[in-house]
UniProtKB/Swiss-Prot annotation:
Pfam families: Citrate_synt (PF00285), Ligase_CoA (PF00549). GO terms for cellular component: ATP-dependent citrate lyase complex; cytosol. It comes from Arabidopsis thaliana (Mouse-ear cress). This is ATP-citrate synthase beta chain protein 2. It catalyses: oxaloacetate + acetyl-CoA + ADP + phosphate = citrate + ATP + CoA. ATP citrate-lyase is the primary enzyme responsible for the synthesis of cytosolic acetyl-CoA, used for the elongation of fatty acids and biosynthesis of isoprenoids, flavonoids and malonated derivatives. May supply substrate to the cytosolic acetyl-CoA carboxylase, which generates the malonyl-CoA used for the synthesis of a multitude of compounds, including very long chain fatty acids and flavonoids. Required for normal growth and development and elongation of C18 fatty acids to C20 to C24 fatty acids in seeds. Transmembrane segments: none annotated. Belongs to the succinate/malate CoA ligase alpha subunit family. Its EC number is 2.3.3.8. Expressed in trichomes, epidermal leaf cells, anther tapetal cells, stigma and in young vascular bundles of expanding leaves, cotyledons, roots, pedicel of flowers and siliques. SUPFAM superfamilies: Citrate synthase (SSF48256), NAD(P)-binding Rossmann-fold domains (SSF51735). One of its GO terms (molecular function) is ATP citrate synthase activity.
Amino acid sequence: MATGQLFSRTTQALFYNYKQLPVQRMLDFDFLCGRETPSVAGIINPGSEGFQKLFFGQEEIAIPVHAAIEAACAAHPTADVFINFASFRSAAASSMAALKQPTIKVVAIIAEGVPESDTKQLIAYARANNKVVIGPATVGGIQAGAFKIGDTAGTIDNIIQCKLYRPGSVGFVSKSGGMSNEMYNTVARVTDGIYEGIAIGGDVFPGSTLSDHILRFNNIPQIKMMVVLGELGGRDEYSLVEALKEGKVNKPVVAWVSGTCARLFKSEVQFGHAGAKSGGEMESAQAKNQALIDAGAIVPTSFEALESAIKETFEKLVEEGKVSPIKEVIPPQIPEDLNSAIKSGKVRAPTHIISTISDDRGEEPCYAGVPMSSIIEQGYGVGDVISLLWFKRSLPRYCTKFIEICIMLCADHGPCVSGAHNTIVTARAGKDLVSSLVSGLLTIGPRFGGAIDDAARYFKDACDRNLTPYEFVEGMKKKGIRVPGIGHRIKSRDNRDKRVELLQKFARSNFPSVKYMEYAVTVETYTLSKANNLVLNVDGAIGSLFLDLLAGSGMFTKQEIDEIVQIGYLNGLFVLARSIGLIGHTFDQKRLKQPLYRHPWEDVLYTK
């Protein structure tokens, strides 16, 4: 292991199995230290995605939530620490998955009781791949003024009291997380404070040992002395003894092994941790303390004397000029949360909406980060605005031109279709523009204009699975599903839909690939062998060509394409386009002052 620092002021982590308080404490520590970016880059919650709202100082931020470790690592390649709050049942599997990600360098396992066989596998893999495991059964670690893991060092008040908001000169490592909090306070009282502190965890087989971190501290110039707090049970301390004897550590080490009282008991005693139990003589606290003394460590006569030993060692370093004075800073005040601040009037209230597509807080609105003035000055069109507000990126001009063509071709299709009919009837009833528009829009669905998304889904699935038109169509037939995007009440083989022809012509001339459109055409060829009106309609044309636009632009991942189709972007295109015509029909009826519409009796079949 060895090498040097694990963390810095720019270190970011992925947090597995979301727990609100530890994450918020990390972010509060970040703010206290004056970090510019939050230390939590993303949260992994198996089975859920989205954003989690948390506070970074006075501002509320949205931290991405990912369903899988692989997706989180891909989305946040600079995050190299994995903080695992999974239960002992799943901690090993998720930790191994994290270790196998090339971007992850450090894994902290909080859970206690991870099977020892699983822990051994994690240790072996980490060592073979030059990675670091902290834990299991750990509270984590901290680099003062830079980064902390989860609940390390406790509350903000304790962190301030221990001066952990700025770096000191002492490297500290212990097995116990609870005792590490006590020792941070002790070190702060008699020295200039902690530089880095690690709790390796109390299980029998820790992922990294006391000596691993002492050797690492020895390579960090800012650390001038080390403090070690071991405990009875196991032989971890002896690896530190060997390192001291071999001269691998050239900085003062103050050490104490807790558990000297175990000899007062007649039988074996199990203390708090799995690894803290009295066993053979070599595992006793007395034997370990003596071995550390013999190796050159500074070991007091009791735990009560540990503070004095640390103080004397530090003062000696100061006298020798090996420690430079630390510049004290005043940490910022962390805002209180709402419930605790109501009485005092110090409040920060959570937001209720997350928006990622536009921002109107500056001097001018921005669409996906592009200022309104730039949109006008650079000659953006409606298609460009849609690409920013719908897809959150600037698409190539041929893509935005295609969007504009779709809008123009789908703006209206006469007064006889269901949407226009409803709008006309509503307008003639004296209703307002919005009511008339909505009346028409509500007819859009699987039978009228709303088949674009379904057409895209089915064509994509069939094409991606290399189904022949026969397999695709007959498979749909067996399921009792009509093929979306195929069939028209008016158009036929001999009377093609001009809109479809125009879209296909544009795509063949401008798209880098029309794979999905060509597949839709082969499906049309097959369906026309069954009936003359089973032509590719405008829904099918837009659906298949939009797949080609998304895939051919090179600006979308497969997952993003699937999400776009699933959410209903393509039907949104028809809704937007047809709104133009429906508004036109509303104005037309009102301008013509048409009376209330009543359907004629002769057009109704009255039957029992």
